[in-house]
Amino acid sequence: MTIAHGHDHAHAAKGESVELKHFGKPDEVREFPKGRVELIRIGGATIGRAIFEPGWRWASSVQPIAKTRSCEAPHFQYHVSGILRVLMDDGAEFDCKPGDVSLLPSGHDAWVVGNEPAIVVDFQGMLDYAKSGR
């Protein structure tokens, strides 16, 4: 069995496809004020690494692009670094810290707490994130 990097597929002995990608070479990058999302398409899914700089807030950085009252993308995230405070539309508020895994339904705002960038890997909800008209 061989493993192909990048956009290539390798076929395992049983006909299964093996893919290996790296966030250092994303398929797409979406930039917005004080942040960016690096997207990788793999196994039929879109995985995103989001980097939010200090001072980033969804309501001011992404809302003008999304044109929705709050973030409508559900998220299933692993929090790599920094602190991300989340405010749900129902009023629940909590912090996501390094090592946390969060499952957020649509209907929320979020912002970086402190002076360290918040970095998350999102396994759901990145397909249309920070895309005009979402």
Where would I find each of the regions flagged by the language model?
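Conserved hydrophobic/aromatic beta-strand scaffold that supports enzyme active sites
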Residues: 39, 47-51, 76, 93, ...
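Short beta-strand segments in beta-sandwich/barrel cores
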Residues: 57-58, 82-87, 110
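Short, conserved beta-strand element in jelly-roll/cupin
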Residues: 52, 68-86
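Conserved short histidine dyad/triad with adjacent acidic residue
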Residues: 49-71
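Double-stranded beta-helix
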Residues: 2-9, 13-23, 111-134
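A short, N-terminal "cap"/entry segment at the start of jelly-roll beta-barrel domains
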Residues: 1-51, 59
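Short acidic-glycine-tyrosine-enriched beta hairpin
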Residues: 88-108
